[in-house]
Amino acid sequence: MHDSVPSQEKLLAIIVTYNPTHSFVGHLEQLCKEFGKIILVDNGTSQDKQATLNNQAQFFGEQKVHLIKNNKNVGIATALNQGFQWAIEHGYEYVITLDQDSTPAAGMVDTLIYALEHHPNREKLAVLAPMIVEELLPRLLQYMRRKNMFLYEHASAETGLLRNLTITITSGSLYNLGIWKNLGPFRDDFFIDYVDTEYNLRAIQQGYEISVQCEARLIHNLGKRQEKKLLGKTLYPTFHSPVR
């Protein structure tokens, strides 16, 4: 399973939802054009918005959209584990995870698949992420790479493949399900924060690799970020919504 290349028949998208806005209806319609199959894992959305999710799933049909419903917010880790397990049980080998408000740029999925196919360490590639472009403050996300036992360094590029990274975010990332099964699920007790970080570090510890393909782009908001000046430096602090 580890060294195969995903096709639309072996790849699906997993989106964790929680009280999505009305714009999610059109968003899901666009995503259905990018993916052959989408799993929605809903984390206790309110009843009025739950009806919209049900209608959307019924509109596209089970062959296109499968809805997993939790009666409360069980957290991002548990929801992802539910989606990953469903994918494995139904014969899928790879998943791409998305936040409900993240938008793949044109060609992101195909670019990730191509990058995986040509990756020099494909059999050990646990996570292949896109380059994140922040919507509110249009800039590329900087990633971290371990320089030595004690130091880390920024790994920045606009093109090409960034290898041996330490931390990526879940949204937009392509996961190898065989490796996920070997490593074990996301930590349910982490709920939301550091779910992706813990998984990546665990993968690295077990000899797997994390990479970013810069030409694959995902439009994403890392919380509510604002540009701030401090001691002559430009900072971008993140202010998360209390309903996360």
Where are these regions (language model features)?
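Short, flexible, basic/aromatic active-site loop/helix in glycosyltransferases
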Residues: 145-166
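Short, well-formed alpha-helical segments that are part of the catalytic scaffolds
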Residues: 14-36
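Active-site-adjacent helix/loop segment of glycosyltransferases
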Residues: 201, 209-244
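Conserved donor NDP-sugar-binding/catalytic core segment of glycosyltransferases
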Residues: 107-142
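Short beta-strand-to-loop acidic/aromatic patch adjacent to the donor-nucleotide binding site
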Residues: 92-103
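Glycine-rich, basic loop-to-helix element that forms the pyrophosphate-binding segment
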Residues: 71-89
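A short, conserved alpha-helix in the catalytic core of glycosyltransferases
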Residues: 173, 179, 183-184, 189-216
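A conserved acidic beta->alpha catalytic loop
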Residues: 42-53, 72, 102-103
